[in-house]
């Protein structure tokens, strides 16, 4: 058996032994959204430490547990703490949570993150709906022997981010009078922030925002046939655009400041997704 799949099955067995809940939407919380759990009607929680072989987040502001519950009447599983490739994990571990949430029953993966704005016109505190992505600078989560039980060897990636879900976000933003931009997200490895020339390269490639997560999770989800949705909170202007040195504290501060609007947008979007599924 594929070692990555064997590890995934052990994690699933740990989950089933402790939790009796089937989510429809999987939500990964980025920086600044960690307390979104307060907006969920919580049924149960499961610490990452209590799942055999599960990778544990080490980043400040990422608590490290699954939350199971309801947003309105929509059953969700929420990752309160994300695992990042730069923490030293293999890429198969980086996407293990995504794969596990699919096995739990989730049909939609809702990705959120804090990202650096690259293109002119981006401002700290903006929201960006991810329409496409660039993941060429980090290892593919599908590298190695294909896990046939999850998906095909050569999956199509021409439309990773579901168009219907994008429309739902835009309608929710309009109803809440929240301005949302659209663009392409690029994932770099981190943990260091980008240099000015790296940012210039990303801009030349057509990226609008840059971060250290999300794209590989989206690939893994698409490989399994999940519908994928992504929103970035532009927490800072990338290196070379602003003269202010970058820091994680700045990222967290901006994300925290816009968290109420971000949480409202996430809630309205999930409610609309639930209505569409019914």
Task: Enumerate the language-model features and the residues they cover.
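Metabolite-binding pocket within alpha/beta catalytic cores that recognizes anionic/polar moieties
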Residues: 1-157
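Non-catalytic positions within long, well-ordered alpha-helices that form the structural scaffold/packing
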Residues: 101-105, 203, 222
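Zn-dependent metallopeptidase/amidohydrolase metal-coordination segment
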Residues: 212-250
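Short acidic/polar active-site loop segments enriched in Thr and Asp
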Residues: 107-108, 208, 227
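Histidine/lysine/aspartate-rich catalytic loop segments that bind and position anionic ligands
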Residues: 134, 138, 144-191
């Amino acid at each position: 058996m594929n070692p990555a799949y064997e590890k995934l099955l052990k994690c699933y067995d740990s989950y089933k032994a402790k939790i009796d809940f089937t989510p429809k939407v999987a939500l990964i919380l980025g920086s600044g959204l960690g307390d979104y759990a307060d907006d969920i009607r919580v049924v149960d929680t499961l610490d990452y430490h209590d799942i055999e072989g599960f990778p544990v987040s080490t980043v400040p502001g990422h608590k490290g547990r699954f939350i199971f519950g309801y947003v309105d009447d929509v059953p969700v599983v929420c990752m309160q703490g994300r695992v990042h490739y730069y923490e030293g994990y293999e890429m198969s571990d980086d996407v293990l949570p995504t794969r596990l949430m699919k096995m739990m029953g989730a049909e939609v993966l809702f990705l959120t993150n804090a990202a650096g704005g690259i293109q002119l016109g981006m401002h700290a505190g903006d929201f960006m709906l991810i329409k496409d992505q660039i993941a060429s600078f980090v290892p593919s989560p599908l590298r190695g022997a294909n896990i046939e039980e999850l998906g095909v060897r050569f999956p199509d990636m021409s439309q990773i981010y579901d168009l219907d879900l994008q429309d739902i976000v835009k309608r929710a933003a309009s109803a809440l009078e929240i301005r949302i931009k659209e663009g392409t997200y690029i994932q770099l490895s981190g943990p260091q922030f980008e240099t000015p020339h790296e940012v210039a390269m990303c801009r030349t490639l057509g990226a609008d925002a840059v971060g250290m997560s999300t794209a590989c999770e989206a690939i893994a989800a698409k490989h399994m046939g999940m519908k994928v949705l992504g929103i970035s909170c532009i927490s800072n202007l990338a290196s070379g655009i602003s003269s202010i040195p970058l820091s994680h504290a700045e990222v967290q501060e901006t994300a925290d400041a816009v968290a109420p609007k971000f949480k409202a947008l996430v809630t309205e979007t999930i409610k609309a997704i639930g209505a569409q599924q019914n």
